[in-house]
Amino acid sequence: MDWIVHQLRVHPELAIFLTLFVGFWIGKIKIGKFSLGVVTSVLLVGVLVGQLDITVDGPIKSVFFLLFLFAIGYKVGPQFFRGLKKDGLPQMGFAAIMCVFCLIIPWILAKIMGYNVGEAAGLLAGSQTISAVIGVAGDTINELNISPETKEAYNNIIPVSYAVTYIFGTAGSAWVLGSLGPRLLGGLDKVKAACKELEAKMGNNEADQPGFMAAARPVTFRAYKIANEWFGDGKRVSDLESYFQENDKRLFVERVRQAGVIVKEVSPTFVLKKGDEVVLSGRREYVIGEEDWIGPEVLDPQLLDFPAEVLPVMVTRKTVAGEKVSTIRALKFMHGVSIRRIKRAGIDIPVLAQTVVDAGDMVELVGTKHEVDAAAKQLGYADRPTNQTDMIFVGLGILIGGLIGALSIHMGGVPISLSTSGGALIGGLFFGWLRSKHPTFGRIPEPALWILDNVGLNMFIAVVGIAAGPSFVQGFKEVGLSLFIVGALATSIPLIAGILMAKYIFKFHPALVLGCTAGARTTTAALGAIQEAVESETPALGYTVTYAVGNTLLIIWGVVIVLLM
């Protein structure tokens, strides 16, 4: 054991990976629906490892923190700038005011309780579950004209206050928005009914949905032998597909075997005759039912031997950006292609007829390879799997953002700046937006983005925990149980105020009120709780714009809270 401790002291990088290993493991454990979460677990494990008196030198903490902030900005950049358009301004304005609540309430409570700068910053970070504030506030504290000892004391108390308030910040937010929120809107049944009403309005019904599919309802391809008298002396492919459409089934003829010859690319004017074998594609429940009408299903490996493709496509074409899904699916190039999924700022949004597709959205298409490829060219940029990250783009973005953040102005002799961390966030926002406009460069594959986001943040948190370890216990004794109660108030008051503001001032649809509030607070866990409570995915429609704004402003509040104190 002594040998292991010695090695961790000599090689502190191993202590960091020990912290990550144990922290991620504990963070995945759930007791019922409760989990500490990875970030809190990594912090607490880092504190325990820090009791071994391990010193982590060098800029490793800052390097990973900048990577994390750039990744955050990169993800939400397209949606952040889209919110500046007229139709996004109400949600953007709501999110900005909500974020002010999230700053002012912790600040007022910190003043009332007599907290110092570090305690106030930790209260903000934990109660609003915005871990990046730890680093941003720390950078700002280091620029203050105070003694090095005071700076160290403030920086060491931030993770203590964060850990005490984060648990209710996460679990409490889910409870306020998922349980209390519907009551504030007139009751759970009323909100459920409002969600169903919005779904119906947006096209979530059997008659309007045959062109769409959920992940649980995959596109399938089946072969049938034509036997129905309806075909008579022959029917064109377009006649058959129109017949399906009239019966609320969006099915397509993909291949035909006629007189023993396989026709691989079938034109709309191709004539189908009794005895032909046809391959139909579409939602599984519709395709399977055609055995009773067309004729018997046949097992023809040769006829069914063709590539089908699932392809994510970034929407960039002006001709489709801003259009409803129902409009896009009616376009000629969407023949044979279904939309399985839409992701916006990394969040899945409902695929409904009236859902508007924005530039920068990632739309997942399903169909035969040649039809999907043709549709992808008309929608935007095919985001094909790759293991290459454009590190020129990443490095340049962080460099430019960091240099901008390093610029400072002096007010009353106090230097004020975004800091390099705030600058990296701004750089990520701009470069993420730029990538959505010009997707031929700046590619960061989703797994790589996950690494930058999750490993970047948790590597930073691990070092913070290890550094704070020796003083953590004493700091916890000083803040005590009272900080937990103050944190609960700092979490709950802005959320309740946000719900009431969204309902009475902004007059959002009840289905969107809770999603907008969750987005402004960037609490994805609460969004899941809301959707589970109201039994609908529609709250996600209010989440993405407010999430982009909240993720930006709440991080910048790490600078502001220090200056206010």
From Swiss-Prot:
An example Gene Ontology CC term for this record: plasma membrane
Keywords: Cell membrane, Membrane, Transmembrane, Transmembrane helix, Transport
Keyword Transit peptide: no
Pfam families, per database record: Asp-Al_Ex (PF06826)
Segments forming a coiled coil: none
Molecular function terms from GO: monoatomic cation transmembrane transporter activity
UniProt family annotation: Belongs to the AAE transporter (TC 2.A.81) family.
Name of the featured protein: Uncharacterized transporter BF1518
Organism encoding this protein: Bacteroides fragilis (strain YCH46)
Classification lineage: Bacteria, Pseudomonadati, Bacteroidota, Bacteroidia, Bacteroidales
